[in-house]
Amino acid sequence: MKRTLLVTLALACAAPGFAHAQRIAPMKAGNFARLCTRATSAGICDAYIGGLTDGVSLSKINDRNEGDPSAPAGFCVPTTETMPVMRSKVLAWLKAHSETLDKPVGESVFAALHASYPCSVKK
């Protein structure tokens, strides 16, 4: 009985580690770049970039609609920036960093936005 309790407790303590796994889109950055260069799919590309941008911005907000304003931001896109400009910056970054084209799209687009829209560091 004591052994069963210890095993159950050990499994319960280990379980939260599995809860942090997140789904990663299977699309590669190279396929995304090809999609973004077609006029017929520019809207899909813009929606993905906008969704990633929103997700990063909203990731500081918890389930009580509270956030940590001191948490570092991954990138800072000005509110006046247009989606076509954002798309062109992401595509230019991907073109300049061809080693990332086999990586997951989210990782590469995040890196492109991070490089293209750095945040001011407050001292």
What are these regions (language model features)?
Residues T4-C13:
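Sec-dependent N-terminal signal peptides
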Residues P84-K123:
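Surface-exposed, polar helix/loop patches in the mature regions of secreted/periplasmic/lumenal proteins
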Residues L5, T79-E81, V105:
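Solvent-exposed, flexible loop/coil residues
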Residues A15-A21:
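Sec/Tat signal peptide C-region and signal peptidase I cleavage site
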Residues T8-L9, A47, A112:
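Residue-level signal for well-ordered alpha-helical scaffold segments within enzymatic catalytic domains
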Residues M27-K95:
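Short N-proximal segments of mature Sec-exported proteins
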